[in-house]
Structure formats: C-alpha cells, structure tokens
A protein has these predicted regions:
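Charged, well-ordered internal alpha-helical segments
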Residues: 278-286
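Charged helix-capping and loop-helix junction motifs
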Residues: 125-129, 271-277
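Short, solvent-exposed turn/loop segments enriched in Gly/Ser/Thr/Pro and often Arg
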Residues: 143-153, 258-261
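A short beta-strand/loop micro-motif in the catalytic core of glycosyltransferases
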Residues: 141-145, 290-293
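Short, conserved loop/helix-junction motifs that constitute active-site signature segments
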Residues: 133-137, 283-284, 307-310
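Active-site-adjacent structural elements in enzyme catalytic domains
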Residues: 115-132
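Metal-dependent phosphoesterase/phosphodiesterase active-site architecture
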Residues: 1-102, 107-110, 148, 158-254, ...
Length: 453
C-alpha cells in the first residue's frame, strides 16, 4: 500500500511520456498480479490445452502444431522478444521489422514473451500490438511472458489463438477456478470479437494457433516454442507435449524457443535441482542445437559445451524487441561468465556513453550508485526500469533465422533500429566472432545436420 502511495505521488509531480516502469501505478500493481497468478499458471495452462485438444479430437501430445505456408524449401522467420510497451523503444524497430518481414524469404514472425505490458490486458492490445505491427503481412505466432499471464491469459488467448480455441481456453481457465472470474461468457465472446475486429482493421494475420505453445516441423528443421509462465515452470501436459515434439524432430535441426533464458546477465539462472534447470538439461541431452528466450531486455549469446554430436548448445537471449533496456548485463558483466564464448549488446562503452549524456539530473544519484558500487546491496539490473529512456539512441534488436536446406545451414542474424548490427557493436569473448570483420553483420552460422545425429 505504501509503495503505491509513493508511486502515486511521483506520478503526480513528474511529466510522463509513453510507458514508464517506476512511475506507472498499474505496473506496481502488476507485482501483486504476479504473486497471485504465478502459482496458478500451470493449472490454468493444463486445463486450457486439455480442453482444446479434446475439442479437436486429438491427444494432447499430438496437438498444437502450426503450418505456415512456404516452408518446402529455403525460408526465414523473425523472432521479436519482449516487444509490448507501445512506446518509442518499441516503435523504433518498426521500419526494420517491416523491411525484413517484406523479404519474400521470410514466411512468418514469432513474438517471444511479454506481448503486452504491463499486465497483458485487452485494453492495451491496440496500442501495444496492432499499431506497432501495422503493415506486417506475414503470419504472427506468439508465446506469452509473465506479464501476459497477469490477467490469466484471457487477452492473449483472444488475440493470438483461433476464436474457437480462445473461447474454449477462457472457459476452461474459469472452470478450473470453479467459476471465480471477472468475465461473463458474453464478455469473453465480446473480447474475442473485438480481437477479430482489430485483426481485420489492421490487417494482422494472428489468431492462428490453438495454445500458448506450438511447434513448426519441416523435413529438416523443427521450431518448438514453449511457455514457461510466471515462475519458469511447465505443467505435465505441456512437458509431455514437448517430449513428443522433440521425439518427432529426431534427426532434424531443433530450435527451442522459451519464455525464460537459462543464461542472462552473465549468470546461469537455473538453480540446480529445479524444474527450470531440468528443462534446459533435457534440451542439452536431447541434442537441441539452439535455445532462444527473452524476458531480459537485451541481446546475449552463450555457447554451452554439451555431449553429443553437436558438442555445443547455442543460447540466444533475444529480448530487445521493444521493452526498456536491461542495463545490468552491460554495466555489471561478471569477471567469470558461465561459458567461455559469449557476447552481448549493447556494449558497455555505448551504454555508458548514453547514461552519461541522457540521464537527467534527478536520476544522477541512481547513476552514481551504479557507477561507484554497482547498486549494492541490490543489483544494477534492479534499477533498469528507472532508466527507461524513450529517446535515441536506442539499443533494441530482433533476430532473423534463415533455414537453408539447399546450403545445409541455419543462420542466425541480428538486426537493430538502423539495420544490421555489426560485430563492433557487441562486447564479446572466447571464440564468439573471432576473426570476423568488425563491420560485418553479427551472424552465427550452424550446420543443418551433423554426423551422428
């Protein structure tokens, strides 16, 4: 209560443009939503998926696949992580996203976690989803982030799932809570109808999937997108589904897209013995080539040595698609990162220069706190929201995945607000980009198949 009062006072005396994290009482309240919804997510998700699969007449471990057109040869797709602020830090990427999506090789787009800030609500979808995506003509799929779950995923379902799956999911969620819900069935149907109206008005090809997770399978490549909810967990139905999809992808190049990353800010975030650690250990043992996730709002890369034919599990943290920048990585990178090969964007020098130039006087005590004692006793990352700059230069990014059976390779390329991001834009260590032209675009090229798979 006291925190909300303080936030209210600060809001009343500060001029706020766009989305602001520390000076937005709804965002403060979302902390309460997280505490309430977190433990319920697995039950909700399992009920939703079970009901939809039953309605479709499919076993749950054989449902929820999507099939974009044009994947019978070489193709590309975009992955945009944590986009949904609806302010300049999201909009600055719009022209580059549209330019890349306009390439005929790009067949679909995936939004990866936190589609709508601060609390995943329907009222924010037009500003934070449809307007920024206007002009995008390729199919759009998504996995939710923790913020999308704060309203029990109702708005995500209405906008990203097929209308039938959305209504079934929303009813199933209410059912598992014994009917304790703020929405009547008529209101659910009205929300779904409004989502259909907005998709039509803005020309967005969404509402194509039937669950908050899905897979895309071609003869050579598999994308398996999973939802790790609020607390980095998956229910039994989703876990069994993922295992079945991994089994179906044996012998293929497998990329897993998740809501939360294993490595972030130069640290292994998976505590040993936890379900979350078990998820990533499973990917390593199963021969997955690439793990990608968002949640932290920047770009990071880690090469994890693993046993098996590939020898490396490549981790991409791809969360720079629109939310405020996570400053902890560049300003508090550890001396001993968890993998020998690593990279992150923006560089420490570039971010420090912006902080020195753009930090207003009343925030200088926070900047001094970071520079002198690394924000002790909290972390630098804890203070990221204070530095939610809505002015250039921005350090947002997204990724393109180019799947080329004709060349036997998969290429991961990094894009920013002005086009290709270059090796000179990153801080990096180990073999990451070793010997690369500093002015060349950041790309990681991997073989589609390796001996022994």
């Amino acid at each position: 209560g006291g925190g909300l009062i303080v936030a209210g006072l600060l809001v009343s005396i500060n001029s706020i443009w766009g989305f602001s994290w520390y000076f937005n009482t709804e965002n403060w309240a979302s902390g309460v939503f997280q505490a309430v919804t977190g433990p319920r997510v697995d039950d909700w998700r399992q009920a939703m998926a079970t009901a939809v699969a039953q309605e479709e007449g499919k076993p749950t471990d054989q449902a929820f696949s999507v099939a974009p057109e044009g994947l019978d040869g070489d193709f590309s797709f975009l992955v945009i992580g944590d986009p949904g602020e609806g302010d300049p830090s999201q909009l600055v990427l719009k022209d580059q996203i549209l330019a890349r999506a306009g390439d005929p090789r790009v067949k679909f787009v995936v939004l990866s976690s936190d589609i709508i800030y601060p609390a995943g609500e329907m009222k924010d979808y037009e500003r934070n989803f449809y307007l920024p995506m206007k002009g995008l003509t390729k199919p759009v799929y998504a996995i939710p982030g923790n913020h999308d779950w704060f309203n029990a995923l109702d708005a995500f379902n209405a906008n990203l799932l097929t209308p039938d799956a959305a209504l079934t999911s929303m009813r199933a969620r209410a059912g598992v809570d014994h009917g304790l819900t703020l929405l009547s069935d008529a209101e659910r149907q009205a929300m779904i109808a409004e989502a259909e109206r907005l998709r039509g008005l803005y020309g967005i090809k969404a509402g194509l999937q039937t669950a908050p997770y899905f897979d895309v399978q071609t003869p050579d490549f598999a994308l398996i997108a999973v939802d790790t909810g609020v607390l980095k967990t998956m229910d039994k139905v989703q876990t069994d589904w993922m295992k079945a999809r991994l089994a179906a992808a044996k012998g293929k190049f497998v990329m897993v897209l998740a809501g939360h990353p294993r490595y972030a800010g130069g640290h292994d975030t998976a505590e040993p013995g936890t379900e979350f650690a078990g998820l990533y250990d499973m990917l390593a043992k199963d021969g997955v080539a690439v793990a990608m996730a968002g949640d932290t709002h920047d770009f990071e890369y880690y090469a994890e040595p693993v046993s098996g034919p590939r020898g490396v599990l490549h981790h991409f943290l791809n969360g720079g698609g629109g939310a405020y920048l996570s400053i902890g990585t560049a300003l508090d990178w550890p001396k001993a990162p968890p993998t020998a090969a690593w990279a992150y964007y923006p560089s420490t020098a570039a971010l420090t220069a912006k902080m020195n130039e753009a930090t207003p006087g009343w925030k200088w005590p926070f900047w001094a706190w970071i520079r002198h004692v690394k924000a002790w006793p909290v972390s630098v990352e804890t203070l990221s929201g204070i530095f939610d700059f809505n002015k250039a230069p921005f350090f947002q990014s997204f990724m393109e995945v180019q799947v080329s059976p004709s060349k036997g390779q998969v290429i991961y390329s990094l894009w920013g607000q002005d086009g290709p991001l270059r090796w000179r834009d990153l801080d990096r260590g180990g073999a990451m980009g070793q010997g690369a032209d500093p002015d060349a675009q950041v790309t990681v090229t991997l073989p589609l198949k390796v001996a022994g798979e």
